[in-house]
Design a protein with these regions (language model features):
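Conserved hydrophobic core/spine positions of the Hanks-type protein kinase catalytic domain
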Residues: 123-130
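Conserved structural core of kinase catalytic domains
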Residues: 58-61, 70-73, 77-120
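ATP-binding glycine-rich loop module of kinase domains
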Residues: 10-70
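Protein kinase-like catalytic core scaffold
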Residues: 34, 79, 93, 154-155
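Conserved hydrophobic "DFG−1" position in protein kinase catalytic cores
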Residues: 26, 38, 85, 95-97, ...
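Catalytic-loop signature of eukaryotic-like protein kinases
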Residues: 140-147
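A short, low-complexity linker immediately N-terminal to eukaryotic Hanks-type protein kinase catalytic domains
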Residues: 2-11
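C-lobe/activation-segment region of protein kinase-like
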Residues: 133, 137, 149-231
């Protein structure tokens, strides 16, 4: 059956329709059973606010997504959505889903994560434990990076990942991947942690910074629990 796709946005109270992702173009089919990541600079979707416009960088993000989510699929298939197709030629990934993402469900129902998925903490912690076991550092942790399928939290957005053998990077070099709101939150936290934005920083430190930053989206005590995995 041929699926008809449309742009997928997050409908955020007080802001309206917002891009679901700053890097790729998010697409969803009409009955919300298939989600597509299209790694292309679609100006209609991003409306001139594109974060990644360099084709080489877009290609790098695409290859990271395919690499790391495939690792997860191979070792921990229950923790990522079923991959329907990897279209290497057109840089599209198709996933089996059941409705809108985890974050959007809370927005649509004006409720908490606990209301949507009572054991979400345990499930998300299992995902981070899998990352740790595979030597993956994942910095795209926003709650829109998860779908729920048959009561199981499924993780996506592996374009901003590195592994235990990756060379340190400077935060300045990846600022185009990070929203302005997130950047405003990150700088004081980098200062508090003694991280120089222009200096190569080990990935274990960046992972700690990511968990610290996403306390704006998740309970602080839960992020602190996740940080312990990378100590």
């Amino acid at each position: 059956m041929e699926h008809i796709f449309e742009y997928y946005y997050n409908n955020v109270p007080g802001k309206g329709l917002c891009r679901n992702n700053l890097i790729y173009t998010s697409l969803i089919n009409k009955d919300k059973t298939v989600f597509c990541q299209h790694y292309v600079n679609d100006t209609d979707y991003h409306k001139g606010q594109n974060q990644v416009v360099d084709p080489a960088l877009m290609d790098e993000k695409w290859l990271r997504e395919v690499n790391y989510i495939t690792q997860m699929r191979n070792k921990y298939p229950e923790l990522v959505p079923t991959i329907i197709k990897i279209d290497l030629e057109n840089r599209k990934l198709f996933f089996k889903i059941q409705g809108v993402d985890f974050w959007q469900q809370t927005l649509d129902n004006n409720c908490t994560y606990d209301d949507i998925l009572p054991n979400w903490r345990e499930q998300m912690l299992d995902i981070f434990k899998a990352h740790k076991a595979l030597g993956i550092y994942k910095y795209s942790l926003h709650p829109s990076s998860y779908f729920i399928v048959d009561g199981q939290l499924k993780s996506i957005n592996y374009f901003f990942c590195y592994n235990s053998t990756s060379a340190p990077i400077s935060l300045r070099s990846v600022m185009s991947h990070i929203s302005e709101d997130r950047q405003a939150d990150l700088f004081p936290k980098m200062l508090a942690l003694g991280i120089d934005v222009d200096a190569p920083t080990p990935h274990d430190q960046i992972q700690q910074l990511a968990f610290e930053s996403f306390k704006t989206n998740f309970p602080a005590d839960f992020m602190d629990e996740c940080k312990k995995l990378y100590v």
